Swiss-Prot record:
Function: One of the primary rRNA binding proteins. Required for association of the 30S and 50S subunits to form the 70S ribosome, for tRNA binding and peptide bond formation. It has been suggested to have peptidyltransferase activity; this is somewhat controversial. Makes several contacts with the 16S rRNA in the 70S ribosome.
Region (Disordered): 29-53, 199-276
Protein name stated in the entry: Large ribosomal subunit protein uL2
NCBIfam families for this protein: rplB_bact
Keywords: Ribonucleoprotein, Ribosomal protein, RNA-binding, rRNA-binding
Cysteines paired by S-S bonds: none
Originating gene: rplB
Length: 276
């Protein structure tokens, strides 16, 4: 896993860099674990834009990922490590002893031919999944459940992980990558280790076209819009504070303070200046 830097034979390639894909062992996905993926173009069921700056991009097929790791006690062998266009992390194809195949997020350090297992009583080893209450303090984990049996929801991007820092009663305290300290029930599953492809953040697109291939459209500043399109539009802003297209002031927290899970946040994440 490394970064391939292009020679500056053109303006676009001067700053372009991509992954060297050294860890990839197969280029075609497992046919039984692939589903069609329809593009929305950022539109909702009324055809209205509900998410800006989305559209176009290369056609993709969805790889069905096992976020639950609920096949307990059955040893699986890592058959292949593959590229997934739908996420920043790589995925690993597991072949279980009973013949079933499943995709999981590729943990850092796992190679083709390694074995993993999930369930209570599993060894604390990279790639194994177990309840958080059985994970030793100081251990890095990823693909963490927030609700028992729902499947992993936290620490799934390339290079991410959370650290087990405390245990008290039924809950385990985790330090997330955002520096947030959060309580998670001890029976929630998590996978030992970090997510692979940690060099993902070092890549540079080099040209606007690369973003378009990924389905990302341009971000237009509010100041260059018309007054009907944005509060900052039309000649000058007039000394107004930076706001969103809907008039919300920059940096205002939008999370509902009465949300039930608010009590599980021991310490909020560190916040920098929001950008518009």
């Amino acid at each position: 896993m490394g970064i391939r830097q292009f020679k500056p034979v053109s303006k676009a390639s001067r700053f372009r860099s991509v992954s060297d894909f050294a860890e990839i062992t197969r280029s075609t996905p497992e046919k039984s674990l692939v589903e069609p993926l329809k593009k929305s173009g950022g539109r909702d069921n009324h055809g209205h834009i509900s998410m800006r700056r989305i559209g176009g991009g290369h056609k993709r097929r969805y790889r069905v990922i096992d976020f639950k790791r609920d096949k307990h006690g059955v040893t699986a062998t890592v058959a292949h490590i593959e590229y997934d266009p739908n996420r920043s992390a790589r995925i690993a194809l597991l072949e279980y002893a009973d013949g079933e195949k499943r995709y999981i997020l590729h943990p850092k350090g796992i190679k083709q031919g390694d074995t993993v297992v999930s369930g209570s009583g599993s060894d604390v080893r990279t790639g194994n999944a177990m309840p958080l209450k059985e994970v030793p303090l100081g251990t890095s984990v990823h693909n963490i459940e927030l609700k028992i049996g729902k499947g992993g929801q936290m620490a799934r991007s390339a290079g991410t992980f959370a650290q087990v820092v405390a245990k008290e009663g039924d809950y385990v305290t985790l330090r997330l990558a955002s520096t947030e300290m959060r309580l998670v029930h001890g029976n929630c599953m998590a996978t030992i280790g970090e997510v692979g492809n940690s060099e993902h953040e070092l890549q540079s697109h080099g040209k606007a076209g690369k973003s378009r291939w990924l389905g990302k459209r341009p971000k237009v500043r509010g100041e260059v819009m018309n007054p009907v399109d944005h509060p900052h539009g039309g000649r000058t802003r007039g000394g107004r504070n930076v706001v969103s297209p809907w008039g919300k002031k920059e940096g205002v927290k939008t999370r509902n303070k009465k949300k039930a899970s608010q009590r599980l946040i021991v310490r909020g994440r560190k916040r920098g200046r929001a950008t518009q």
